[in-house]
């Protein structure tokens, strides 16, 4: 049996440093922080550092994932350090090692250019040294100093920077691999494995993963390993394959390799089979053994959990469940086959790169996924086989798949599946569609159910089979027609809703008939307001889909998701929220009657509709009434047990509660919880009387229902004011309704359900400024304050800390706690005293708007003294602050949806209003912004509203400015600059793109973006930067405030300002970025237009509208461009060269489509940082020889460069190239050998009609497009392309022969 090991390198981190400067101070603290994060760091154990660098140290550098280079004053005095640096630089270039430079009391520019004190020290070291050695040192110093790192001069103290360095290293080491981000369903598997592994337990644990081949066991294990690795200092992922050798020496060999991998020790020798236990008994390890098929191997390597230290986890993966049992592994995760819906997503991910198919492939995808079966590997194989193929090819393949899978694919599947299921179905070829036109469709006349009330709607699908109104495929075309106006169910409609339907009609796209999912249709039904007949329509769709051959159990319209959509649709039609009040009306006493009246009156007062639900006098549960409400108030009294009927209904209500999102608020009216739980007091006698003649199982259901409702918690009343209780109950109901509509606030809902919790709870609420955190915290406080011995609500904590300082706030807090008469000061009260004093008292404490965890701890004396019955609620704009305050799970308040924003708008604006859509967009779902904007706009005349709204964006209300400023002012300079760049230039752009460009500008962009997310200033949606419009406006206002004159501002985006600066030649060194939308603009620029913009980092001239050309002319040429540019994007660049004086040393992206350039410039330039070059459709371009200097180039786009003939001298030099697009380069004839381009994944030569010859393919190509070329034969190296998934040879009419390809490549392509 042979083993292939796929664990990590020997060391996580290699530190390079001068021991004279940092060993006993900075380095010692850094190593401690790294060790605390379980990061394996190389230590030289006092190795003498004035000798020549030896082989062991070179090996340690090469086998480390990250090198931290600590530049200090005397770093360059050591040839040892400088030789180390050369090796690190080599590993950075050749092995993609991560390098983190740290500048300890030395400026980066001094290191980079060897100037100042650092340069003097370096000069002394260089004396008498060979020139080639000095040159290597200088190159390494310049290159490494140019990498984004940490400069101590930019940090308040060493401790803060050390913590940040350690955090950054940890993130770089342990970030989850992108390899698993697009694996469909992986999160559910990881969650299931986490519950089996019980990571919080200190006991070592051995578990198994079992399932057939192809089910995804290894993928799950690799994702699990990636996720858990940060928690274990020692870890290994090992894959085994069977071999015939199985003797004692082989077992020793297994152990040697196994321990070498885990311990990071080379050439380790073991003498006996007990070495695993002896080496790992006291170590916490993570071990994953993949593809195990030999019990002896398990006994040898992981004999029992006692061999490993506390907290260790061992995961064994096998197809043989009995092998796990034989090794006493009883905790086994059996990987299940995916559901039909999940199988479709797996197939689509492979076929289209996303979990849903394009609209014109929907029906085909459903059938292909069905025919592939439910084994993930088969689904992926078939998906990859169809990837990139045209729809006609799919249709052509379909008959073969239905009858018998084509031979090669079937042969592949047989390796994984014993039986290939066949599906024979007769598909109806066509669907007769309704003629569409601009007409008003009244469902009363043309569709049964338009005005049918809910209790009249036919539910069984069989009821539709005899209707002659429409053919089975007619429903979707009707609702898809955007010109159709649908009359909603008038029972539920009102003027507000009708106006919203018109508002939506202009915002939502039309629905494409027959090419939509169940969710698409239901979404469309909801937004187009076919709500009165939604259930009927869905029934019709269920029946219609049978015509497509979809089985009832596989029908997406029967899914729970559709049910929830229908309920959401019903929710949206309500004018007011309905709240149920459960009671036994026939047995009420005077107090209960009075209380129900008080509840009803208070509900009306707060805008709710009370629905009284009598549990007596009903044969069956009224489901319509239950589904019509989201909250039910249950009044529990002794009258409940006076009737079997009421108890049966209680059981039914609780069953409904368990399966829906109904919230129950119990009121224990003149009864005690202990009486209900233990059936004591008045409950006991009444229950015994009912019990005597009944079956035991019915009685047990009653008891279970009563236990469940008691577990919820609630309100008790024995005597006192019923009106006060009614107010408290209704406030509770109102808050719960709000929290239920707010995503991720389920924990706060749980908080309300367990008001008498005995454990200390520290809850946290976070979200962007103006989202409503304070309002929610205040509601919770007022609701629960009566139940606590001591309550304290400190609003505007951040502002109060600025005004009074934390010490004074602590004095106020102590005074509130103990009372001023006790005369205790902050210095008198220690945490231990607090713990003892409040040991048997309950405390409710709210700190609102916390911005600093240390301030919070200083005011309340830390969080350690709180104990049972104490509850702390914190609100903050920063999630990280809450985590630092020991909040286990912070709850985020989501922004308002468009619908919720619309409802809020209608509270202030009457009738139709032309700016509602703009108000919703401009507020970005922030309640504070929306209220203030709507309030201001509502005071204007209709004709002035739009202009007034635009002026508000340039000068927002004071409250919006103050809310934003507080967050912005708390950022450091790095984060402020990043935020302003994002606000001015990168909103809606890819995060990776922003990081690439801004890192080149000297910012720590990744860390900055993380901090901005934590501060709720931005968010990521599909890896794109999203920023609320009010925050973007405020960011731009800050830039405007820099100076009245645009030429003195750092960032320019307004076309009028930019044109003024450019045409007047008034640019200055203050300008760092220009993004000009030149659509419909025409202007002439001076040759010296950029002459004084020394600090310009980002330059983009573009056209946002198709068909327009960027008409910025340079009639007298262009003298130069700023050397600081990291982005140069200029569409339709008018000159034949870039300025010869331009030094692109900092250039990361050169994007100049449709330019007039013949070549970039004469001679060689420093292009070390250049990553992307896009010169597409530059029809005069003939020479790209200068790209040979761009050694780090990753993406080349030369599409449509029709004058380009030869690239043989430039492309082979781009050793890090990932994609090469030369589509439609019609004069290109050949390409040189690309065997050295090991990173190249995509090659596109489609449309290169004269292209004839390619010598060799890059070895790791995944996509090759040669359609329409004149190629005669393919290189034999195509047989070795193990990663190839797409090979396009369409219309290659001169292709004479094709090398025979391995079956694996044919299967993938």
Curated annotation (Swiss-Prot):
Protein task: Disease resistance protein that cooperates with RPP2B to confer resistance to Hyaloperonospora parasitica isolate Cala2.
UniProt-recorded name of the protein: Disease resistance protein RPP2A
Positions of the catalytic residues: 84
Keywords: ATP-binding, Coiled coil, Hydrolase, Leucine-rich repeat, NAD, Nucleotide-binding, Plant defense, Repeat
Organism: Arabidopsis thaliana (Mouse-ear cress)
Coiled coil: 1114-1141
Keyword rRNA processing: no
EC number(s) reported in the record: 3.2.2.6
Short name of one Pfam family: ALOG_dom
